[in-house]
């Protein structure tokens, strides 16, 4: 391990872009298949790992949704969330905001209550066991209707105190953010924080970024590297101090060899970049430390810049000022020890 890799490993981190359904590693997938008596096309962990290959967003979602079918019971959601938080804590993640997609489950007849109770229990147990604080962000699925998103928002209300924000994810094609404008407006009125995926090199991505910022008024952009294609959008993001939850390895899959240098351009432009792992189980188990290492090499990040990226994450987190100051003080103490 190099000095910079050791530095990255020990950095106190926050993760703001992580899909819980995207943390279904091969071992747990096989376990759930046996537990729930749902046969897989694969018969071994090695074969499952081999199946985690894709070349674009559509082929990724096909594999992703296959894994979702195995999640049936509260304990399944508990195991999924607890496993991620244990792994994150081992990589010095002290705070995490975790996306979950209830529509992927309710459309299969799984109740919202089953999903959320498993996640809440895992969140609380992980805090007790690993001292990692985490919160949940509920995402709407772009391919599904506005009406279904509205129903999902209504279903979330009994658990509003357990959900910090609302996001939008999945396939962008023909599913712009503006499609969900009214449900986002209502979510804001209810007190939810707002974010939105604007994925790398998808059709009309810069239009989607503009809609997310100007029409919906999100507080963060998930991915969002294509903002570099529009100087006016860059100006708007800088004026509003919009954080970008960038995911180096998933970007590398979509845009090989070029995604990491664009992180360098974003930083040099003054944009508020954070580094995250997205769907690590489906991306060669590149969790946050591996994503930091990839970005560091590809964007030639210094230790000072790595600390600033971590600082960006804590500043962008949807937490109390008391917690934010606590995390920033710990980060500053860590950085000072390396000066």
Swiss-Prot record:
UniProt site positions, description: Important for catalytic activity: 223
Q: Which GO terms describe its biological process?
A: adenine catabolic process; hypoxanthine salvage; IMP salvage
Free-text remark on how the cofactor is bound: Binds 1 zinc ion per subunit.
Q: Tell me, what is one Gene Ontology molecular-function annotation carried by this entry?
A: adenine deaminase activity
Give the cofactors, semicolon-separated.
Answer: Zn(2+)
What are the entry keywords?
Answer: Cytoplasm, Hydrolase, Metal-binding, Nucleus, Zinc
Grouped into one coarse class, the protein's main location is cytoplasm
Q: One Pfam family, please name it.
A: A_deaminase
Annotated SUPFAM superfamilies? Metallo-dependent hydrolases (SSF51556)
Q: What is this protein called?
A: Uncharacterized deaminase C1683.02
- The organism encoding this protein is Schizosaccharomyces pombe (strain 972 / ATCC 24843)
């Amino acid at each position: 391990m190099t000095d910079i890799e050791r530095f990255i490993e020990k950095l106190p981190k926050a993760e703001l872009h992580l899909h819980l359904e995207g943390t279904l590693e091969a071992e747990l997938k096989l376990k759930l298949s046996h537990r729930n008596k749902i046969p897989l096309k694969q018969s071994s962990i090695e074969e499952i790992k081999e199946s985690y290959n894709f070349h674009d967003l559509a082929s990724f979602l096909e594999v992703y949704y296959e894994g979702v079918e195995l999640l049936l019971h509260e304990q399944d959601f508990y195991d999924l969330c607890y496993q991620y938080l244990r792994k994150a804590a081992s990589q010095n993640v002290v705070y995490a905001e975790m996306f979950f997609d209830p529509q992927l489950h309710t459309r299969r007849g799984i109740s919202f209550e089953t999903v959320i109770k498993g996640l809440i229990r895992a969140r609380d147990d992980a805090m007790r066991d690993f001292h990692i604080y985490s919160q949940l962000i509920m995402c709407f699925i772009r391919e599904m209707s506005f009406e279904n998103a509205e129903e999902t928002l209504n279903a979330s209300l009994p658990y509003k105190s357990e959900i910090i924000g609302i996001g939008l994810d999945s396939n962008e094609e023909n599913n712009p953010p503006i499609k969900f404008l009214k449900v986002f407006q209502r979510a804001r009125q209810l007190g939810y924080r707002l974010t939105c995926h604007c994925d790398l090199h998808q059709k009309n991505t810069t239009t989607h970024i503009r809609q997310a910022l100007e029409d919906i008024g999100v507080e963060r952009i998930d991915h969002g590297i294509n903002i570099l294609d529009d100087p006016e959008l860059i100006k708007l993001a800088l004026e509003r101090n919009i954080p970008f939850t960038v995911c180096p390895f998933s970007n590398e899959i979509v845009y090989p060899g070029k995604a990491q240098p664009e992180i360098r351009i974003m930083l040099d432009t003054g944009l508020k970049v954070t580094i995250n792992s997205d769907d690590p189980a489906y991306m060669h188990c590149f969790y946050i430390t591996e994503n930091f290492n990839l970005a560091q090499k590809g964007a030639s990040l210094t230790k000072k810049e790595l600390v600033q990226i971590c600082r960006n994450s804590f500043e962008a987190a949807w937490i109390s000022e008391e917690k934010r100051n606590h995390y920033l003080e710990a980060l500053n103490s860590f950085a000072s020890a390396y000066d």
